[in-house]
Amino acid sequence: MADPEKILKVSVVTPDGIVYSHNATMVAMRAIDGERTIMYDHLPIVTPLAIGEVRVKRTHEMNDRVDHIAVNGGYIEFSNNEATIIADSAERARNIDVERAQSAKKRAEQHMQEAKEKHNEREMLEAEIALRRAVNRLHVRENYGK
């Protein structure tokens, strides 16, 4: 059993509402400057997140299960052993619709090709971001969605 004094409260919130909220012993994510892991009593931090996977190691009562969440930007704020991730969008691995993610990937690839042909850098950047989001969702679902 996890020491109740060493538990974090982890929440992931999007403009659509709460996507995830559980007690945990660790949360790891990709910040814009690299991988970050937060455990009990970590110093307070606010940092922007990159498109990537968030891993939450649940408490021993949950057999140390690790939950995986696809996060598309945002930031994490941690203080007083509460981690709140405010994300542009986020989905738990088990909730990701593979067909939708594959369609988004295909659309992004088409937009990239069109932007390349038009030599439009802004559209190319937007398409690259959309592609990274779709690939992230597919990766999280295919590797961790049960």
Curated annotation (Swiss-Prot):
Xref: Pfam families: ATP-synt_DE, ATP-synt_DE_N
Disulphide bridges, residue numbers: none
Record membrane topology: Peripheral membrane protein
Chief localisation class: membrane
Keywords: ATP synthesis, Cell membrane, CF(1), Hydrogen ion transport, Ion transport, Membrane, Transport
Disordered: annotated segments: 102-122
Keyword Plastid applies: no
A GO term, aspect molecular function: ATP binding
Cell compartments where the protein resides: Cell membrane
CC annotations in GO: plasma membrane; proton-transporting ATP synthase complex
NCBIfam families per UniProt: ATP_synt_epsi, PRK00571.1-3
Function field: Produces ATP from ADP in the presence of a proton gradient across the membrane.
Subunit note: F-type ATPases have 2 components, CF(1) - the catalytic core - and CF(0) - the membrane proton channel. CF(1) has five subunits: alpha(3), beta(3), gamma(1), delta(1), epsilon(1). CF(0) has three main subunits: a, b and c.
Family: Belongs to the ATPase epsilon chain family.
Record HAMAP family: ATP_synth_epsil_bac
Name of the protein: ATP synthase epsilon chain
Organism: Lactobacillus gasseri (strain ATCC 33323 / DSM 20243 / BCRC 14619 / CIP 102991 / JCM 1131 / KCTC 3163 / NCIMB 11718 / NCTC 13722 / AM63)
